UniProtKB/Swiss-Prot annotation:
Residues 43-54 have a biased composition (Basic and acidic residues). Residues 31-42 have a biased composition (Polar residues). One of its GO terms (biological process) is pyrimidine nucleoside transport. It comes from Homo sapiens (Human). PANTHER family: SODIUM/NUCLEOSIDE COTRANSPORTER, SOLUTE CARRIER FAMILY 28 MEMBER 3. Residues 330-348, 508-527 dip into the membrane without crossing it. Changing S568P: Decreased uridine transport. Normal localization to the cell membrane. The chain crosses the membrane at residues 103-123, 129-149, 174-194, 198-219, 228-247, 285-305, 362-384, 387-408, 444-469, 567-577, 591-613. Changing C602R: Lower concentrative capacity and altered sodium binding capacity. This is Solute carrier family 28 member 3. Keywords: Cell membrane, Endoplasmic reticulum, Membrane, Symport, Transmembrane, Transmembrane helix, Transport. Residues 21-30 have a biased composition (Low complexity). Expressed in pancreas, bone marrow, trachea, mammary gland, liver, prostate, and regions of intestine, brain, lung, placenta, testis, kidney, and heart.
Length: 691
């Protein structure tokens, strides 16, 4: 491009220097004494014959001071460039050796943690035992994961000859194994019954009865695959045996229950700050419901960290290998131990449109037969034994698979493989604080749902009882009530779980509450009976039983530990339909069967608890007390003291000289118990001396 300069009038402080040499830039054209003079280029515009665009050139002239400033700026730029170069060098080194640096940092942290654990064990091993056990378990599982990820194929190749040999003889070998296990259980029950009583046999008969009922009303009784059924019941029995009958298992779960209870008590700090120091005056609203908020927050944080997914995968893998259930069923069943019936399907949400009807039924059954970790804390706050609630949550997972595969057997080939099912989504939170906030916020709907349902159901229950009493009064039977009807409907089921006969009607009432309302109402009534028993109140008042025995409490705790109620039916249908709209018809058609299967799964868990419960059955106190105070029999024995305590707690004193012994005992036995124990809570002077 060719540029032509044009003439322009010279003015003060202005010159056309667009194409002057560098020496002209230093010329001082303004003599007025200014420190610096700037020259601006005049725009040269020339329209050439080739129609080139216009071009503007601007040149700025600098003074000596400006040159000094420019030199300072150059030095700063050089310094900044040096820092940037060093920073880039460090970043490049970190990126290049990222793996090594990460290993070094984790090694330092792990070494510091191990030093802390060893120091704690040296100072007081008994005090540091929980920390030691947790550390050993964590190291074992981390090493196991590392070895399995690296050497899984080699281990599989090593075990393949034994697997082929086992498969070739499995047809007759499986019958030998199962027959041996059944005979072992029968002999064990025989010896155990001789020691503890005959109630264990009733629970065993109840378990057989529920299995037969599920088989008779099965969707496809001729297509039942018995491996998941038998292994599900077997896992139940093994877990119950480990927890309820072995000292290490019982101590471990009892310790775990106490730790959970202590952990939940930290909710009181937030509740007292928000609601005031007298928040316990409104126990359920301000004491129980905040526990749901706190537990939901903690579960959300654990889910963000990936700990929940890791545990669920491990438990699901165990059930997959043992029961032979599909990967989807195993993951959801294990997830229901920790999360609720609408949260656990989220673990496998991408695969819901492709699962079979039997798998869909198993997913719903698992939700009905277990409870969520968030409401577990609320039940513990009622006073229900935490160790039994935790045990019931774990035992119900394999029970749900056994009941589901028996009530709706698999008739199709599952499409989802193990590798796909074990890929679970992590939380969508950006950091741990956001996860905690989302967990607390998500509990709002749960807390509101619990509160409004309790208000509605208890009000409805009161109205139903009033209406039934009004109706019964027309036939001279004003005591007709919803509880009475349920006690007769569900009494056979509660008795076959192993509940004592006199308690079976009261436990049947709890089952009615749980089925037609929800488990909160049932556990609330159970907690009242537990508190009455612990306070040593009379067992009978005006001939009406006030609470149940410890064994019946334990069995009821297991039977009620599930979401199997009519209200949850709508929740499950709505939740699963929103995740898989294409399966709406299948979900609706299988929901009622899943509700029944979930209820029976809870009953089966209660039967296992009844078989394994080591709580001694009631002694024949009539015979013991009538003979204890004769001269030929010793009076102060363990059985006599236990019978006397039961007699005194069930005795009703209406006034001086008007005492009614509990349990149809005689005044002679009551007088002897007063002489033996000299109780401070009972006035023995009111007993008549004439028998």
């Amino acid at each position: 491009m060719e540029l032509r300069s044009t003439a322009a009038p010279r003015a003060e402080g202005y010159s056309n220097v667009g194409f002057q040499n560098e020496e002209n830039f230093l010329e001082n054209e303004n003599t007025s004494g200014n420190n610096s003079i700037r020259s601006r280029a005049v725009q040269s515009r020339e329209h050439t014959n080739t129609k080139q665009d216009e071009e503007q050139v601007t040149v700025e002239q600098d003074s000596p001071r400006n040159r000094e400033h420019m030199e300072d700026d150059d030095e700063e730029m050089q310094q900044k460039g040096c820092l940037e170069r060093r920073y880039d060098t460090v970043c490049g080194f970190c990126r290049k050796h990222k793996t090594t640096l990460r290993h070094i940092i984790w090694g330092i942290l792990l070494a510091g943690y191990l030093v802390m654990v060893i120091s704690a064990c040296v100072l007081n091993f008994h005090r540091a035992l929980p920390l030691f056990v947790i550390t050993v378990a964590a190291i074992f599982f981390v090493v196991w994961d590392h070895l399995m990820a690296k050497y899984e194929h080699r281990i599989d190749e090593m075990l393949s000859p034994g697997r082929r040999l086992l498969n070739s003889h499995w047809f007759w070998l499986k019958w030998v194994i199962w027959s041996s296990l059944v005979l072992a259980v029968i002999f064990w029950l025989a010896f155990d019954t001789a020691k503890l009583g005959q109630q264990q046999l009733v629970s065993f008969g109840g378990l057989i009865m529920y299995i037969v009922l599920l088989f008779l009303f099965s969707k496809y009784p001729t297509r039942v695959y018995w491996r998941p059924v038998l292994w599900g019941i077997g896992l139940q029995f093994l877990l119950g045996l480990l927890i309820l009958r072995t000292d290490p298992g019982f101590i471990a779960f009892d310790w775990l229950g106490r730790q959970v209870q202590t952990f939940l008590e930290y909710t009181d700090a937030g509740a007292s700050f928000v609601f005031g120091e007298k928040y316990k005056d409104h126990f359920f609203a301000f004491k129980v419901l905040p526990i749901v908020v706190f537990f939901s927050t903690v579960m959300s944080m654990l889910y963000y960290l990936g700990l929940m997914q890791w545990i669920i995968r491990k438990v699901g893998w165990i059930m997959l290998v043992t029961t032979g259930s599909s990967p989807i069923e195993s993951v959801v069943a294990s997830g229901n131990i920790f999360v609720g019936q609408t949260e656990s399907p989220l673990l496998v949400r991408p695969y819901l449109p492709y699962i079979t009807k039997s798998e869909l039924h198993a997913i719903m059954t698992a939700g009905f037969s277990t409870i969520a970790g968030s409401v577990l804390g609320a039940y513990i706050s009622f006073g229900v034994p935490s160790s039994h609630l935790l045990t019931a949550s774990v035992m119900s997972a394999p029970a749900s698979l056994a009941a589901a595969k028996l009530f709706w057997p698999e008739t199709e080939k599952p499409k989802i493989t193990l590798k796909n099912a074990m890929k679970m989504e992590s939380g969508d939170s950006g950091n741990l604080l956001e996860a905690a906030t989302q967990g607390a916020s998500s509990s709002i709907s749960l807390v509101a749902n619990i509160a409004v349902n309790l208000i509605a159901f208890l009000a409805l229950l009161s109205f139903m009882n009033s209406a039934l009493s009004w109706f019964g009064n027309m036939f001279d039977y004003p005591q007709l009530s919803f509880e009475l009807i349920c006690s007769y409907i569900f009494m056979p089921f509660s008795f076959m779980m192993g509940v004592e006969w006199q308690d079976s009607f009261m436990v049947a009432r709890l089952i009615g509450y749980k089925t037609f309302f929800n488990e909160f109402v049932a556990y609330e009534h159970l907690s009242k009976w537990i508190h009455l028993r612990k306070e040593g109140g009379p067992k009978f008042v005006n001939g009406v039983q006030q609470y149940i025995s410890i064994r019946s409490e334990i069995i009821a705790t297991y039977a009620l530990c599930g979401f199997a109620n009519i209200g949850s039916l709508g929740i499950v249908i709505g939740g699963l339909t929103s995740m898989a709209p294409s399966r709406k018809r299948d979900i609706a058609s299988g929901a009622v069967r899943a509700l029944i299967a979930g209820t029976v799964a809870c009953f089966m868990t209660a039967c296992i608890a009844g078989i394994l419960s080591s709580t001694p059955v009631d002694i024949n106190c009539h015979h013991v007390l009538e003979n204890a105070f004769n001269s030929t029999f010793p009076g102060n024995t363990t059985k006599v003291i236990a019978c006397c305590q039961s007699l005194l707690s069930s005795t009703v004193a209406k006034g001086p000289g008007e005492v009614i012994p509990g349990g149809n005992h005689s005044l002679y036995s009551l007088k002897g118990c007063c002489t033996l124990l000299n109780p401070s809570t009972f006035n023995c002077n009111g007993i008549s001396n004439t028998f």
